[in-house]
Regions:
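Receiver (REC) domain active-site loop signature in two-component systems and cognate sites
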Residues: 58
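Acidic catalytic/metal-coordinating carboxylates
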Residues: 35-38, 61-68
Length: 127
């Protein structure tokens, strides 16, 4: 994947599609996933985004569970994570439990998201 590739993990179809389009408009490559399990499957199949943008509240494998699974896998643990959440309490719990690289509260301005993603879009070293 390109060094500006984002794995967008969001269960809300409209938000996932609008985020994906906004990121593409800003020069990012995008791989969408509807939940944590789909994201994990993509990663286990070899997807290597430079950053993961994920919601916490999703059906099935949620954002917390995905983050824990990523942490347990040495090959995936180093991929930066930007958490998005509609609930600040939820986001604060995530930060305290397992600090992400960035955390944004929904709704957010797209420029703030782009800035956060660009901070973390460095190519990962090859293993």
């Amino acid at each position: 994947m390109a060094s500006r590739e984002v794995l967008v993990v969001e269960d809300d179809t409209d938000l996932r599609e609008s985020l994906s389009q906004a990121l593409r408009d800003h020069g990012f490559g995008v791989t969408p996933a509807t939940n944590g399990q789909e994201a994990l499957d993509l990663l286990h199949a070899g997807a290597r985004p430079s950053v993961i943008l994920l919601d916490l509240m999703m059906p099935g494998l949620n954002g917390w569970q995905l983050r824990a699974a990523l942490r347990r896998d040495p090959g995936l643990a180093r991929i930066p994570q930007v958490v998005i959440s509609a609930y600040m309490d939820e986001a604060e719990q995530a930060v305290l439990a397992l600090p992400p690289d960035d955390c944004l509260r929904k709704p957010f301005h797209i420029r703030i998201l782009i800035d956060a993603l660009e901070r973390h879009c460095q190519p990962l070293p090859q293993t």
